[in-house]
């Protein structure tokens, strides 16, 4: 899935809700080489909210590791008040225009995201850089 831009953040969260996603994996940074790759579609700080017309997304907890950031989110449908927990992984060290020289850390990252996915019995919603 392509990362959302500012005008498509609400649509992104609608897809997350409709697909019953519990895990989001982001392989790029928000900005690379000074260019915005996608809009910051979640709040990076605990207890902050992102509000769209249909959903409220609350950041519950943020864990920073050397190669990734793991953010625990809760999305709530404003109409039904139903909510769901989401784990968001942002990979920090994927090179902008190439493959990593050492893939051991990335293999560990994949294994860890798969453990989380299997725990909630859901597919992963991948977020990659925008395609022009």
Curated annotation (Swiss-Prot):
The superkingdom listed in its UniProt entry is Viruses
InterPro entries in UniProt: Prot-tyrosine_phosphatase-like (IPR029021), Protein-Tyr_Phosphatase (IPR050348), PTP_cat (IPR000242)
Q: Which residues form the Tyrosine-protein phosphatase domain?
A: 1-132
Check the record and name the SUPFAM superfamilies matching this protein. (Phosphotyrosine protein) phosphatases II
List, in alphabetical order, the Gene Ontology terms for molecular function in this entry: protein tyrosine phosphatase activity
Q: Which residues form the signal peptide?
A: none
Give the matching PANTHER family.
RECEPTOR-TYPE TYROSINE-PROTEIN PHOSPHATASE, TYROSINE-PROTEIN PHOSPHATASE DOMAIN-CONTAINING PROTEIN
The UniProt entry's sequence similarity note says:
Belongs to the protein-tyrosine phosphatase family.
Q: What is this protein called?
A: Tyrosine phosphatase-like protein N2
């Amino acid at each position: 899935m392509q990362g959302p831009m500012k005008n498509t953040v609400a649509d992104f969260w609608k897809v997350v809700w409709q697909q019953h996603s519990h895990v989001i994996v982001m392989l790029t940074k928000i900005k690379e080489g000074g260019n915005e790759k996608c809009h910051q579609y979640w709040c990076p700080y605990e207890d902050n909210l992102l509000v769209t017309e249909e959903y409220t997304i609350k950041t519950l907890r943020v864990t920073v590791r050397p190669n990734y950031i793991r953010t625990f989110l809760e999305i709530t449908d404003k109409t039904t008040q139903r909510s769901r927990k989401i784990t968001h992984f942002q990979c920090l060290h994927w090179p902008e225009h190439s493959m990593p020289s050492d893939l051991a850390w990335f293999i560990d990252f994949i294994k860890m995201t798969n453990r989380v996915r299997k725990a909630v019995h859901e597919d992963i919603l991948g977020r990659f850089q925008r395609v022009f």
